[in-house]
Amino acid sequence: GKGVVFMGSFSKTMATGLRIGWTMAEEQVTDALLQTRFDLGVSPWVQRTILEFASNGMLEKHLEKVNAIYKRKRDAMLAALDERCSRYATWTRPEGGYFIWLTLAETVDAKKLAEAARELGVAYVGGYAFHIDGTGQNTIRLAYSFANEDEIPEGIMRLGRALEQASQS
């Protein structure tokens, strides 16, 4: 629509090292963006390769494959959470993306959880890191994108133990 600028990146869909993005907007806006000529030194060869990859249908095939992998990982994490953690938290059921957000039950001490999880070898990001107003203390973000699908149940089992240790009930 008029006045809308849509931007994206190939960093998440193809490879994290690719610092190439794209923009869809009215011609006047894209012309102004092109005048900046600021590209962080991205190789013209890499840019051309991405253009060919996207233009000949390979990007769609790649995305189908990647989406199937992420869906399996997400489903594995959701199943493990349902089995092990429902007493201590609720969570999102994302349609896409890379993360599941947990909201801790009032009985769970977030600081104790961080300590217990660390001791059990579980890494997550506390939700407070995503809030500028001090909220989010009772939330955590779990990433399933990088995790090995076969290791997800074990990781969630450990998280469940940490939640149990951090629970006051």
Spans of model-derived segments:
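Short beta-strand segments
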Residues: 8-9, 22-24, 92-93, 99-103, ...
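PLP-dependent enzyme catalytic core of the Aspartate aminotransferase-like
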Residues: 119, 135-169
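AMP-binding (ANL) adenylation modules
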Residues: 129-134
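Conserved core segment of the aminotransferase class I/II
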Residues: 3-68
